Amino acid sequence: MEDFVRQCFNPMIVELAEKAMKEYGEDPKIETNKFAAICTHLEVCFMYSDFHFIDERGESIIVESGDPNALLKHRFEIIEGRDRTMAWTVVNSICNTTGVEKPKFLPDLYDYKENRFIEIGVTRREVHIYYLEKANKIKSEKTHIHIFSFTGEEMATKADYTLDEESRARIKTRLFTIRQEMASRGLWDSFVSPKEAKRQLKKDLKSQEPCAGLPTKVSHRTSPALKTLEPMWMDSNRTAALRASFLKCQKK
């Protein structure tokens, strides 16, 4: 699974996931399913923000050309992927600027058009079950919840899906592709089932050989969302690195 993750996701997403796990004392080489889940969640957050801007009239627009326009502002602020200290700094700054209520838990995004924090969920289970778990944990009507599954299902607060259908379809397609790629390598069952995951871990520890059949070439796509990670905490070199294109699993 670890080899698959490093082949399937952008190196900067992998790095952010590793740092997040180490911050909580977790080892990506051992807890590989969690490693894959965190990388997937990060990519969904970036894709959620991709191409969405606010124009000078305050209207939400979609721009895919990548041409710079000084009158456009990113619609979403990405909070997920930052270390906890800086993430709370961003949240506090948003709250002070907009006057919105400070959440008790770190959200994943902030929507400048709707003026609300967003909690993104990616589940291997039933979407309604995961949604209820999220809602019960957050216990706040101010934070919008949007759940995606690997089967193409989704659920959002008050059935308000925030994004247009095409943008959501891109996310669903990516998740389905990840599922198919895992399944083709015999990794999906262990990713879904905790019992199977333990069995797979024991098997992985016995054999350190790289996973057969991993793609050696991947397609490239630039993600404008990575630019929104710039404020407050990145030097120019890291910003340039984050602007590197996403690496995707090779389609069969």
Swiss-Prot record:
Q: Where is this site: Important for efficient shutoff activity?
A: 202-203, 206
**What organism is listed for this UniProt entry?**
Influenza A virus (strain A/Turkey/Minnesota/833/1980 H4N2)
Name-wise, this protein is: Protein PA-X
Residue numbers annotated as active site? 80, 108
Tell me which UniProt keywords the record has, alphabetically.
Decay of host mRNAs by virus, Eukaryotic host gene expression shutoff by virus, Host cytoplasm, Host gene expression shutoff by virus, Host mRNA suppression by virus, Host nucleus, Host-virus interaction
Q: Which gene encodes it?
A: PA
Which residues are annotated as site, described as Important for efficient shutoff activity and nuclear localization? 195, 198-199
Secreted among keywords:
no
Q: What does this protein do?
A: Plays a major role in the shutoff of the host protein expression by cleaving mRNAs probably via an endonuclease activity. This host shutoff allows the virus to escape from the host antiviral response. Hijacks host RNA splicing machinery to selectively target host RNAs containing introns for destruction. This may explain the preferential degradation of RNAs that have undergone co- or post-transcriptional processing.
**Which BP terms in the Gene Ontology apply to this protein?**
viral RNA genome replication; viral translational frameshifting
Recorded family membership: Belongs to the influenza viruses PA-X family.
